[in-house]
């Protein structure tokens, strides 16, 4: 394929993670060093920044600050939850994107996000092909939910899993100091896939953690749940439970759904308040001391507990997206595949068609969940343990983390 010269845009979308900026660094640094990419732009708040022509000139940033992106949590360029309509129904946004691309001679578009972001990538790529504008579009994976289809795991997941396991080990210590027992219910993110909540099993396996784990891969039954909690509490004098925010009844309704009717830009229910709800029910049923804990945003931005493996792989994903695009590849998402070399975990990249990834979800294999549907098996531990290895090389100022400070100079 012939060499394509032009500018590139990197955008971030969806929920932030501890390592999404590491992927942005991988894209930006590789693009700045490429002889084919003439200018590197960062879209403010994802695709909305493209639509509004608010693009940061990344060549104006201090290289040292760009390096710090690898250890800076959240989305440094700004994120969004903006659903693109089908261009056959309404192509207004697509015409605007094409206009902005032409203005800045954008020939490479990299979008860093999860399921919905890959859908956006796919739609933009197909539209550009339809109108005959050459632009290579690549998806860079990101989601703490770990539910992107076709990839062994997703950047961001391992760091969140490590944070969850560590936090539950600490909560366990706190909950066991008194002479009166406590029932502790910890709510963890995950609407349809329980990868994050399952990570709580690491705390139990390698220290002290939950006695019971409930995932959205199986139907939740309140009576069975209460019986499980009462059994453990009676046997041990205490009980710790990890629950996914997305646990649901057999009819598909979320246990926490009655607490809120809010939705995001993609129509997904805004879940939350499950721990408090279950704690109230358990307290009424048992009369025991019960505490509900919601990890909330902390589990996705804990850069101080990030996995160095996760950081390195996130950079690798961004770098691979640029290298493959410059080589002539388009319409793909960078994915990970796992290998074992001399008994050690090795991660390599592969490419998946965007059409195979967009709007599909990967859930925990049912065979990794125990028969009682209140815990996970060793297969899951074997899967996740290599991913959380290594400590982040955080720079510090006055013993506090020094995160990247971008100038964010808007392109003209």
Predicted regions mapped to residue ranges:
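Short glycine/serine/threonine-rich phosphate/pyrophosphate-binding segments
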Residues: 17-27, 50-51, 93-95, 115-123, ...
């Amino acid at each position: 394929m012939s060499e394509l010269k032009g500018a590139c845009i990197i955008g971030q979308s969806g929920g932030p993670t501890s390592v999404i900026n590491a992927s942005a660094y991988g894209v930006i640094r590789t693009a700045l060093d490429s002889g084919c990419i003439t200018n590197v732009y960062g879209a403010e708040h994802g695709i909305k920044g493209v639509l509004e022509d608010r693009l940061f000139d990344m060549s104006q940033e201090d290289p040292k600050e760009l390096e710090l992106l690898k250890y800076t949590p959240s989305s440094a360029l700004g994120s969004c939850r903006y659903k693109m309509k089908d261009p056959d129904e309404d192509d207004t946004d697509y015409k605007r994107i094409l206009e902005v691309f032409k203005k800045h001679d954008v020939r490479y578009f990299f979008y860093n996000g999860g399921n919905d972001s890959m859908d956006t990538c796919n739609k933009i790529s197909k539209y550009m092909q339809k109108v005959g504008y050459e632009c290579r579009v690549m998806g860079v994976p990101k989601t703490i939910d770990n539910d992107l289809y076709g990839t062994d795991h997703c950047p961001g997941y391992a760091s969140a899993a490590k944070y969850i396991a560590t936090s539950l080990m600490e909560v366990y210590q706190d909950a066991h100091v008194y002479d009166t027992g406590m029932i502790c219910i910890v709510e963890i993110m995950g609407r349809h896939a329980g990868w994050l909540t399952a990570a709580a099993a690491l705390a139990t396996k390698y220290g002290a953690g939950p006695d019971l784990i409930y995932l959205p891969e199986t139907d939740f039954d309140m009576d069975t749940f209460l019986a499980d909690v009462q059994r453990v509490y009676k046997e041990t004098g205490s009980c710790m439970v990890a629950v996914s925010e997305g646990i649901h009844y057999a009819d598909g309704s979320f246990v926490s759904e009655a607490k809120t009717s809010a939705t995001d830009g993609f129509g997904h229910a805004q879940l939350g308040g499950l721990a408090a709800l279950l704690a109230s029910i358990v307290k009424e049923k048992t009369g025991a001391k019960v505490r509900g804990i919601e990890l909330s945003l902390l589990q996705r931005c804990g850069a101080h507990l990030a996995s160095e493996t996760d950081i390195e792989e996130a950079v690798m994903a961004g770098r691979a997206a640029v290298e493959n695009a410059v080589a002539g590849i388009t319409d793909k998402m960078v994915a990970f595949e796992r290998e074992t070399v001399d008994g050690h975990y090795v991660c390599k990249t592969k490419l998946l068609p965007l059409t195979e990834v967009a709007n599909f979800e990967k859930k925990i294999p049912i065979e990794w969940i125990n028969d009682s549907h209140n815990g996970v098996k060793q297969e899951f531990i074997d899967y996740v343990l290599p991913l959380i290895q290594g400590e982040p090389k955080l720079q510090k100022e006055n013993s506090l983390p020094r995160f990247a400070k971008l100038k964010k100079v808007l392109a003209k």
